[in-house]
Amino acid sequence: MRRWVSPLLLVAIVFLLWPNISPAPIIYRPGEGWSYESRGAMGKWRRDRAKAQLDVAKEAAAKEDWRTVYKAAKRTVHEWPLSDYAPEAQQLLAQSYEARGDDERAFKEYQKLLRYYPQNVDYEEVQKRQMLIADRFLGGQRFKLWGKIPLYRSWKKSAEMYQEVVNVGPQSEVAPMAQMKAGEAWEKRADGFHVSERERHKDFGRAVEAYKKAYEEYQTDDTVAAEALYKKGTSYENQSKDAEYDQEVTMEAINAYEDMLALYPGTPKAEDASQRIAKMKTEQARGSITIAKFYEKKKKWHGAKVYYDRAIDLAPDSEHGQRAKERLAVIAKYMDETDAVETE
């Protein structure tokens, strides 16, 4: 047994001490993070001056070598954050993430670009890039785990992206549409699966607030303002479909549609809004008829009259309105008899 130990030990020592070069080194650098570098490329992209380092990133971008763009641009920003070359490097860093399919991280890097270097970039162009990214997520693109593995859709994150666009540039060209799409994202979330109705209604409420803000902040743009009021109405209308919120929220929906019709009568959505108002008022009239019948059975004629009158006010030409008029004629004599008895 001992005869085998010494040779094996010798072989192990020689193996461990034998000089080897890793064919695929993974390197960590403070501020730059982990990176993979092939044996032939190690250090070739690194420079000692900001301009030279940025030039490496730009040359790599021209060749669509986005891995090198990422490394060179990130090093420029980390090592020389206050240099004149940092803004362009930050933009290239964001573009490298976008080109490599990590849209969420790209959005964040564009956001850093606008916050830290707002005077050194084409503000509108950067925000348009952010809108394209947010639009992809709103369209159903999945957010990725570790920037690599498509995992889940998130309308909440999509809404927050649009809201960040607005927060950073509230008067920019894309801000009104970003505010509207934030509301659209919350509506999509409300239409999805929820553990409770309360959570669903919270999301509709967030959509309402987004559209309300769009109207208040951008009402000088008639197209945006009219659409904001319309979408505010549809959000309230969808919320009202739950019985708990029926009357109060239905009135909010009607008010939003009526505001749109009064302020922007020529909007393409005018006819649809009118039809929605009529439908909701007809449904409210039906509810009033039901309550009126309850009072009528109890021989509470005056109470019944109140609700029949309400049904007529809401939808005079509807089936429910006509029914209310007929019942009012019937109970009128009972009301007179009751009044006569009370007078005696």
Predicted regions and their residues:
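Acidic, polar-rich low-complexity tracts and alpha-helical solenoid repeat scaffolds
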Residues: 21-344
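Bacterial N-terminal signal peptides that target proteins for export
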Residues: 1-9
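Bacterial N-terminal signal peptides
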Residues: 8-17
